[in-house]
Amino acid sequence: MSKIPSVNIKALLDAGVHFGHKTSRWNPKMASYIYGERDDVHIIDLRQSVALMSVALNAIYETVKKDGKILFVSTKIQASDIIAEYAEKCGQYYVNHRWLGGMLTNWKTIAGSIEKLNKLDKTLENEEALMGYTKKEILNMSRKKDKLLLSLAGIRNLNSKPDLLVVIDTNKEHIAINEAVKLNVPIVAVVDTNSNPDNVDYPIPGNDDSIRSIRLYCSLFADAALQGLEESMKASGVDMGAMQEHTDKGLTSKNVSKLKQAKKFSKTKNIDEETNTEFEQALNDADENKNSDNA
């Protein structure tokens, strides 16, 4: 049986996941996910991050295991390349530049744009066909193609709505989240101390700005998806040697049953004692190191 990836307190601390925003910028709806504050910066309760990450990774695993499609979304600069890298690694879909309004709710229009992109691609790759165009016309076609690729490269093989949306910054991607909610698409999202966790089925409290944090999240998400893919292929009797080829092409389109919503661990009693101790000790060690540096 495939093993769903997991994460511990130390890995999250090393990636800076515990650093929230300045206390003046917080969203009160995140109160239950905040451990405290240090130097006017909110500290995220990593005990809950560990527990809720596990729930989110299981949701990703189960979605792909059942041949579902996952759409990764983050258009912020520091996450753009990382999102694309890990979505491609696990054969899923992504939007990493501008979210076009209606990408989910007005799919017919988006599908038309994808068709236009594919036609431009086909024309520009056909040397014989290009002989009928002027250099200026070819240049204009290339520019149109590049513009479409920025928004559509990660979804050009997506033929229907995704079964799960994975978001890094809920504030920046609020339009994508609203569209997913309208279509009843479950949402996994990293929620920082200035985020609104409403409408997020699988919240993961954590820093959504740090490149190290974002890379850690995406690595875990991709690993969970790959484990789900492996289970799906085994169940279908697919040759595991074809794993890489299958991943490169993306997953087939099948309906997936609605995933159960994640339980929100808003109280520390829901977290095991070992994780409690590990987190508190790690914070104490960090304070001691800071004090010794200032001595």
From Swiss-Prot:
Signal peptide: none annotated. Belongs to the universal ribosomal protein uS2 family. Gene3D superfamilies: Glucose-6-phosphate isomerase like protein, domain 1, Helix hairpin bin. The keyword S-adenosyl-L-methionine does not apply. One of its GO terms (biological process) is translation. PROSITE patterns: RIBOSOMAL_S2_1 (PS00962), RIBOSOMAL_S2_2 (PS00963). It comes from Rickettsia africae (strain ESF-5). Residues 247-295 are annotated as: Disordered. It comes from the Bacteria. This is Small ribosomal subunit protein uS2. Keywords: Ribonucleoprotein, Ribosomal protein. InterPro entries: Ribosomal_uS2 (IPR001865), Ribosomal_uS2_bac/mit/plastid (IPR005706), Ribosomal_uS2_CS (IPR018130), Ribosomal_uS2_flav_dom_sf (IPR023591). GO terms for molecular function: structural constituent of ribosome. GO terms for cellular component: small ribosomal subunit.
